[in-house]
Curated annotation (Swiss-Prot):
Protein name: Aspartate--tRNA(Asp/Asn) ligase
NCBIfam families: aspS_bact, PRK00476.1
ATP-binding is among the record's keywords: yes
Gene: aspS
Native source species: Herminiimonas arsenicoxydans
PROSITE patterns named in the record: AA_TRNA_LIGASE_II (PS50862)
GO biological process assignments: aspartyl-tRNA aminoacylation
Length: 599
């Protein structure tokens, strides 16, 4: 039917007959000549329908946007002054000799070049939305990324092995999606949150290097830019230490960016430990494009009269930090007030600040309502510690460390990305990757009054930290590592526990009894007793990588058929009700069901 793609038709085909298939992107009647912009996945080509060919011209008069056509014609130069440098085919046009309507179209609910469509409209009519060039480009880049990943891993000796989609429910942080078993009444499968345990078992089984590009499922609370199903580049390898694993996969990401975007990422990636990341940026995935850092002022604030500062400085797990904004003294009060409202989202009760007008004058050179409640020695130490200069602004965070880190960490990014930040050189618009390492092995859950695994309970402790799991879990560090790029976690992993007795120690630290551990993880504990090799791995979020590479506004723009923030598919209206007969077969009865809000 077709000899050439529309978007690839060029001067190389001048005076040749081509057959094209595609959709009417736009039809223009110029009083005697009809122009059709015909579109396929490769782009557009201009087709000319001349009244001298009566049958072609008559058919062209009837076509409308999104009609599916087959056109045969001669490639010729466009008339002088009508070329389009934005198109590969912009120097030529096709004079139609034949025009066949393969399928007409009803009037589309929107124009494909409308950039102001709501996401609801786009997702409801996803098939049409996917015809848009931007969506075509996004998904083709996604394909290219997966191909580059496969080529790299294949060359490194990794084997693509599928793991089960119907598996056992085990705690990994989020809620599982459960699948009732009809033939095993009262029992449920779970859809995997990750192939974590299976890939470890594959290492015990001597497959040495495994990978899989697979779907994972998490029944999480509603959050922006999260999907209940997502795609993971999942990898595991035996007989490699933490540094070797990081080096290997850093090379993979560097190659993907080079071959897909022609971007040279730094070699090697910088490495930062978790404590430094939290101390300087309030985040374990800091955006290194932003040139702002925390200054810890906790010790300085312990004896000041300003109770907001001294109270936080003296409380357990309290923290006081300063965020110096060079040139921020020029920031209008309205912008400062807006930032005050912004940090409230993260639990901050306010946003104190000091403008440094003339630091040589001491207290008299500082402008802020809080200055009167801070003694001269503390003020001098604040200026010295932050390195503030005339014309600078210092924001302060004072509260529990988590609130300060969340609020001032978000403020740091907000200021850096603002027009003010970009105009004042506080933001570098480039790719800034980073490894974050030495994560805490455990974190304390105040609600349940027990320790939980920071990553997952199969992460190995750092050398020399094994005994801390029982004596001081809060000081125990792990062999975990995250790859961060421009404030996003691209992937994370760890060296795994390969000895059953160490795995049992972790379960004890997490208050998982031997009986519960055997019930939930007995298959893993048993496997570890058969000479399990040292092993570790990493998993990358494919959706997130492609979102960053395309510059898409939402992760939903790089997934063909995504769910909404309410975990619904507006195209198919999933999830849906099922009939009573199906429920009875599954031994399920619904109770107190609330109406589902669609959209």
């Amino acid at each position: 039917m077709r000899t050439q793609y529309c978007g690839l038709t060029s001067e190389a085909l001048l005076d040749q007959t081509v057959s094209l298939c595609g959709w009417v992107h736009r039809r223009r009647d110029h009083g005697g000549v009809i122009f059709i912009d015909l579109r396929d996945r490769e782009g557009l080509v201009q087709v000319v329908c001349d009244p001298d060919r009566v049958d072609v011209f008559k058919a062209a008069e009837a076509v409308r946007n999104e009609f599916c056509l087959r056109i045969t014609g001669i490639v010729r130069h466009r008339p002088e002054g009508t070329t389009n440098s934005n198109l590969t085919s912009g120097k030529i046009e096709v004079l139609a000799h034949e025009l066949e309507v393969l399928n007409p179209s009803v009037t589309p609910p929107f124009q494909l070049d409308d950039d102001n469509l709501s996401e609801t409209t786009r997702l409801t009519h996803r098939v049409l939305d996917l015809r848009r060039p931007q969506m075509q480009n996004n998904l083709r880049l996604r394909y290219k990324v997966t191909m580059e990943v496969r080529k790299f891993l294949d060359a490194q000796g990794f084997i693509d092995i599928e793991t089960p989609m119907l598996t056992k429910s085990t705690p990994e942080g989020a809620r599982d999606y459960l699948v009732p078993s009809r033939v095993n009444a009262g029992h449920f499968f779970a859809l995997p949150q990750s192939p974590q345990l299976f890939k470890q078992l594959l290492m015990v089984a001597n497959f040495d290097r495994y990978y899989q590009i697979t779907k994972c499922f998490r029944d999480e609370d509603l959050r922006a830019d999260r999907q209940p199903e997502f795609t993971q580049i999942d990898c595991e390898t035996s007989f490699m230490n933490e540094q070797e694993i990081r080096d290997l996969f850093e090379g993979m990401i560097r190659l993907v960016f080079k071959n897909c975007l022609n971007v040279e990422l730094p070699n090697p990636f910088p490495v930062m430990d978790y404590a430094t990341a939290m101390g300087m940026y309030g985040s374990d995935k800091p955006d290194m494009r932003v040139k702002l850092e925390f200054t810890d002022l906790t010790s300085i604030m312990k004896d000041v009269e300003f109770k907001v500062f001294s109270g936080a400085a003296n409380m357990e797990n309290g923290r006081v930090v300063g965020l110096r904004v060079p040139g921020g003294g020029a920031m209008p009060r309205s912008e400062i007030d807006a930032y005050t409202q912004f940090v409230a989202i993260y639990g901050a009760k306010g946003l104190a600040y000091i403008k440094v007008n003339e630091k040589a004058k001491g207290r008299d050179g500082l402008q802020s309502p809080i200055v009167k409640n801070i003694h001269d020695e503390a003020l001098a130490k604040i200026i010295e510690a932050t390195g503030a200069q005339d014309g600078d602004l210092i924001f302060f965070g004072a509260d529990k460390a988590k609130v300060v880190n969340d609020a001032i960490g978000a403020l740091r990014v907000k200021v850096g990305h603002s027009d003010f930040g970009k105009k004042n050189g506080l933001f570098d618009d480039e790719w800034r990757p980073l490894w974050v390492v030495d994560f805490p092995m455990f974190e304390y859950d105040e609600d349940s009054q027990r320790w939980s695994a920071t990553h997952h309970p199969f992460t190995a402790p750092k050398d020399g930290h094994e005994d801390l799991m029982e004596t001081n879990p809060g000081k125990c560090l792990s062999k975990a590592y995250d790859m961060v790029l421009n404030g996003w976690e691209l992937g994370g992993g760890s060296v795994r526990i390969h000895r059953a007795e160490v795995q049992s120690k972790v379960f004890r630290a997490l208050k998982i009894s031997a009986e519960e551990a055997q019930l939930k993880f007995g298959f893993l504990l048993d496997a570890l007793q058969y000479g399990a090799p040292p092993h570790g791995g990493l998993a990358f979020g494919l959706d997130r990588i492609v979102t960053m590479m395309t510059g898409a506004e939402s992760i939903r723009d790089v997934i063909a058929f995504p769910k909404t923030q309410r975990a619904q598919c507006l195209l198919t209206q999933a999830p849906s009700e099922v009939d009573e007969k199906q429920l009875r077969e599954l031994h399920i009865r619904l109770r107190n069901v609330e109406p589902v809000v669609k959209g």
